[in-house]
Curated annotation (Swiss-Prot):
Name assigned to this protein: Queuine tRNA-ribosyltransferase
Enzyme class: transferase
Purpose: Catalyzes the base-exchange of a guanine (G) residue with the queuine precursor 7-aminomethyl-7-deazaguanine (PreQ1) at position 34 (anticodon wobble position) in tRNAs with GU(N) anticodons (tRNA-Asp, -Asn, -His and -Tyr). Catalysis occurs through a double-displacement mechanism. The nucleophile active site attacks the C1' of nucleotide 34 to detach the guanine base from the RNA, forming a covalent enzyme-RNA intermediate. The proton acceptor active site deprotonates the incoming PreQ1, allowing a nucleophilic attack on the C1' of the ribose to form the product.
Cofactor requirements of the protein: Zn(2+)
GO cellular component, one term: cytosol
SUPFAM superfamilies in the cross-refs: tRNA-guanine transglycosylase
Binding sites annotated in the UniProt record for substrate: 96-100, 150, 193, 220
Chain positions recorded as Zn(2+) binding sites: 308, 310, 313, 339
Length: 380
């Protein structure tokens, strides 16, 4: 393989766990790890400007291959000079392969060795996505980090189905590597699958590591399994991945899952969670989730989170934000989205410091106790 445009630099290992502090070097800059990546599905992180994302120290964002292929089209993005120019973002971008959306959004899917035929969710047109096409789209988009086309089987699928699926995903990964036109300035990651089966995760990992990708993703989690089941898969999967390459846990954004993923050696995470729940008036705070649109906050003139120094918490009250959301004002969604993204990015900063201080287990215990996992919303 040619020299990879994506390099991982290990800075420090935490003494008591698998957590590691590092940085990832890309053609559009360097970002620290562990890192949470805000999701910009349609080439925008919903309601946020690039300047606001930089303000909250989002070192890298994610864009969605499936959605951008359907609209506005990857050829148009290429003519615009690639995603970075198209959306005015000069820092790293990661694109997914489109596979997860094909399996979760599209109708009437038919999976064969060649690829996946489906009806697109916008207009019902018949579409055909292959490993080569997924790579071609991402080459046009021009992201720094690309994903191989994979199948994401449901966590509780039968063993024989998952075995056939991971073997096909490995063949697809090899086809994607061969189709990659820009290995000099775009790094392609392989995606480990295998549901909850340890031997299949091992087989999938061995297949992909033998292909020498610049980085590896752990897929097929956060799809309905329990928190304990996710941790168990990470316990036996992450140690199999090369120490000198980035490790990316796909689709995970709950605070406890971020901390537990880091403890098990994961470097990168993404999820739509912070912006999706923000649009329903749900805010993550140091004391747990707060549903600001609830009536109890109508005359609450305090910030969303007393321990947060984000723009929203420094300038606006729960009562005002509740009013905006009840009145269907976009500014309310902007304020809650900003806060939730800031909360997770700030959490990752604290996690990085805990790795430096070799006390991530104590940090986890303190965070979980304050956040109040297992209790319903209370007054605070």
């Amino acid at each position: 393989m040619t020299h990879s445009p994506i390099q991982y630099r290990l800075i420090k290992k935490e003494k008591h766990t698998g957590a590691r502090l590092g940085e990832i070097i890309t053609p559009h800059g360097v970002f620290p790890t562990p890192m949470f990546m805000p999701v910009g599905t349609q080439a925008t992180v919903k309601t946020q400007s690039p300047e606001e994302l930089k303000e909250m120290k989002a070192g890298i964002i994610l864009a969605n291959t499936y959605h951008l292929w359907l609209r506005p089209g990857d050829d148009l993005v290429a003519r615009a000079g690639g995603l970075h120019k198209f959306m005015n973002w000069d820092q790293p971008i990661l694109t997914d392969s489109g596979g997860f959306q094909v399996y979760s959004l599209a109708e009437k899917r038919n999976i064969t060795e060649e690829g996946v035929t489906f009806k697109n969710h916008l207009n019902g047109a018949r579409m055909f996505l292959t490993p080569e096409k997924a790579i071609s789209i991402q080459n046009n988009l021009g992201s720094d980090i690309m994903m191989s086309f994979d199948e994401c089987p449901q966590f509780y699928q039968p063993y024989d189905y998952v075995k056939a699926s991971i073997e096909r995903t490995s063949r697809w990964a090899e086809r994607g590597l061969k189709a990659h036109r820009r290995p000099q300035d775009q790094g392609l990651f392989g995606i480990v699958q295998g549901a909850g089966f340890e031997d299949l995760r091992r087989q999938s990992t061995a297949d992909l590591v033998s292909m020498d990708f610049p980085g590896y993703s752990i897929g097929g989690l956060a799809v309905g399994e329990s928190h304990e089941e996710m941790n168990a898969v990470l316990d036996f999967t992450t140690p199999l991945l090369p120490e000198n390459k980035p490790r990316y846990l796909m689709g995970v954004g709950a605070p406890d899952s971020l901390i537990d993923g880091v403890i098990r050696g994961v470097d990168m995470f993404d999820c739509v969670l912070p912006t999706r729940i923000a649009r329903n008036g749900t805010c993550m705070t140091s004391r747990g989730r707060l549903v600001v649109k609830n009536a109890q906050y109508a005359e609450d003139f305090t910030p969303l989170d007393h321990d947060c120094d984000c723009y929203t918490c420094q300038n606006y009250t729960r009562a005002y934000i509740r009013h905006l959301i009840k009145a269907d004002e976009t500014f309310g969604l902007r304020l809650t989205s900003y806060h939730n993204l800031y909360f997770l990015l700030n959490l990752m900063e604290k996690i990085r410091q805990a790795i430096m201080d070799d006390n991530i287990l104590e940090f986890r215990e303190d965070f979980i106790e304050k956040y109040g996992y297992g209790r319903s919303e209370r007054n605070f």
